[in-house]
Amino acid sequence: MADAKTLHLYQRHGDYIPRVAAVHDLCGYGKCSLGVAIPVLSAAGCDVCPVPTGLFSSHTAFPGWYMHDTTNIMEDYTNAWKGIGVEIDAVYSGFLGAPEQVDRIRDLYATYPNALRVVDPVMADHGKVYPTYTPELCDAMAELAAGADILTPNLTEAAIILGEPIGDDWCGTDISDAEAARMIDALVAKG
């Protein structure tokens, strides 16, 4: 893990363009996931190498969505990069389609040990876990979060990572500064 005092999303060296593996889902309809990450990171001056974790007809807020889990292709997909000498400066992960995908992200960490590890643990919001997320997938995401250089959970995701209860009566949208600080300290203590 990188030293927090020296963390930068990227540092430009001359004409060098930093390369980010963006490990996230791709939605055909709805502004989220790789559809947002690719243009934002590109506008920030990064070369984005997408690694789709799932293909969605739309995000899960729309009724009747379809998901195709891409776990079975991820290893061959990223191993092909090794064959052509692709170098990665950051691994940015978001929505995952299955617990096994954490192993594919760890493979990227092992292949690119100096890459910045950015984890956006996309799995829940407003006290509710997304419909594709099982307890096993939430646990796997919490394990992945512990190895992040930069972690960007919302309040619900932070509670899940910390093993704190959430639900319909959960008021995680209005917390005190002291409670937010407690959660941040607990997340940092996890790794």
Predicted segments with their positions:
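Conserved phosphate/ATP/ADP-binding segment of small-molecule kinases
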Residues: 132-191
